[in-house]
Amino acid sequence: MTVTDNPADTAGEATAGRPAFVSRSVLVTGGNRGIGLAIARRLAADGHKVAVTHRGSGAPDDLFGVQCDVTDSAAVDRAFKEVEEHQGPVEVLVANAGISKDAFLMRMTEERFEEVINTNLTGAFRCAQRASRTMQRKRFGRIIFIGSVSGMWGIGNQANYAAAKAGLIGMARSISRELAKAGVTANVVAPGYIDTEMTRALDERIQAGALDFIPAKRVGTAEEVAGAVSFLASEDASYIAGAVIPVDGGMGMGH
């Protein structure tokens, strides 16, 4: 295979001991912008069939979009049914949809705490539970949660966000212990300080200060996060289960 070949064009061809590429049905929640969009486009470029969820803003023309609110179990079920009709049962789930509602601990309301947990953690659970139905029947599945360095490091003013992202690690490991024997694995990709619209909007002093905690001394890109997801979605990652892969320039080392 030359460097210009598309993996989809060489499906079924194993090379140098590597397993053959298999095009999978992929769903990326919150895949219409930011890190989620970069992940969706990378997986599509890899040769997979990719659908993305959005909350009403639509999806880019090059991706199949379905409207979904991950805090609503019925909406999650409808979204999965749409994807199944369009490209078959979901074989790779990237649970990326999330929000942040930062506040000092003493000022954080229960409503704000629960809103983030419901979206970032329980929403991921709803999607993973729904995806696991067909994954177990097919005896293949990749569940990839998009976590955060905050879930390991515990960033201040993010009690809700850090708790949700830490919860994804426990959930991935529980799912893997339960379902890996059926060919279904769950892992976490934990981005650090990534160049997105949200981080670019931060005060320049905050941006500069963040680099003090990053050994690589630079901001990461959404495409670098997508690269880690691409690997976990591949046949090469079949023996990886319950792992946390940081994409943070060393920011969360040792946690």
UniProtKB/Swiss-Prot annotation:
Cellular compartment(s): Secreted, Cell wall
Primary subcellular site in the record, as a coarse category: secreted
Enzyme class: oxidoreductase
Gene3D superfamilies in UniProt: NAD(P)-binding Rossmann-like Domain (3.40.50.720)
Function: Part of the mycobacterial fatty acid elongation system FAS-II, which is involved in mycolic acid biosynthesis. Catalyzes the NADPH-dependent reduction of beta-ketoacyl derivatives, the second step of the FAS-II elongation cycle. Has a preference for longer substrates. Can use CoA derivatives as substrates in vitro.
Notes on the domains: Upon NADPH binding, several residues are pushed away from the active site, allowing the enzyme to adopt an open conformation. The transition from an NADPH-bound to an NADP(+)-bound form is likely to facilitate release of the product.
Protein name in UniProt: 3-oxoacyl-[acyl-carrier-protein] reductase MabA
Species name: Mycolicibacterium smegmatis (strain ATCC 700084 / mc(2)155) (Mycobacterium smegmatis)
This protein's encoding gene: mabA
